[in-house]
UniProtKB/Swiss-Prot annotation:
The keyword Secreted applies. Lanthionine-containing peptide (lantipeptide) with unknown function. Does not show antibiotic activity against Lactococcus lactis 117 and Bacillus subtilis 6633 bacteria. Organisms that produce this peptide live in oligotrophic environments at very dilute concentrations, suggesting this peptide is not secreted to influence other bacteria. It comes from the Bacteria. It is found in: Secreted. Keywords: Secreted, Thioether bond. The keyword Cell cycle does not apply. It comes from Prochlorococcus marinus (strain MIT 9313). This is Lantipeptide prochlorosin 1.1. There is a cross-link at residues 68-72 (Beta-methyllanthionine (Cys-Thr)). Coiled coil: none annotated. The lineage of its organism: Bacteria, Bacillati, Cyanobacteriota, Cyanophyceae, Synechococcales.
Length: 81
């Protein structure tokens, strides 16, 4: 269930400039922001997403911009462009 929650949260962030601004703030707590937005994700979900590599098919489907999760321990940042 958490993987689906993370994917839904990422989709919401890509469409919501308010969430993007919250996540861009220095020291933003991604898990807390997701929870406040109604999503249930964990730091483990973020770590797993960060380690995941894209397949050739995924790379072919990229239309621009990027999503990146960075950090250590409980501190993660999301870059949305």
């Amino acid at each position: 269930m958490s993987e689906e929650q993370l994917k839904a949260f990422i989709a919401k962030v890509q469409a919501d400039t308010s969430l993007q601004e919250q996540l861009k703030a220095e020291g933003a707590d991604v898990v807390a922001i997701a929870k406040a937005a109604g999503f249930s994700i964990t730091t483990e979900d973020l770590e797993k997403e960060h380690r995941q590599t894209l397949s050739d098919d995924d790379l072919e489907g990229v239309a621009g911009g990027f999503f990146c999760v960075q950090g250590t321990a409980n501190r993660f940042t999301i870059n949305v462009c």
